[in-house]
Amino acid sequence: MTYDELKTRIADYLNRSDLGNVIDSFIDQAESEINRKLRHKDMIKRSTAVLDNQYSQLPGDWLGAINVDLQTGDPVPLFQKSLESLDLYRNSIQNTSGQPKYFAIDGDTLEVCPTPDQSYTIQMTYYAEIPALSSTAVS
């Protein structure tokens, strides 16, 4: 089914022909709701990044972490903490640098602790947003 066919079916289901302008908004809202609630194996993605400071940008389609590993020969898992717990831990080690052990998510940013003492490659396994439909991205 194409995007235009979906819009036609929605209008037919509602038995309204005057909703052409709001059906796009209806589809956007449905996609947002699906991305908030659905977690399916087909949404799982992997991404690597170089971690050389306390913060790293998350992928643009990030919904939630499954796991984050340092790629140092054998993968070394980083354990997720709340931002508050990460700050408390950072204070307890007097903000020393070292191999990261923990991570927290702050919006679109990954924060690690301790602050990396060198560049590390990390692999992030995460749930990704379902690509949005539009008149140009029809399936």
Which positions does each model-derived feature cover?
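Glycine-enriched, solvent-exposed interface loops adjoining structured elements
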Residues: 1-139
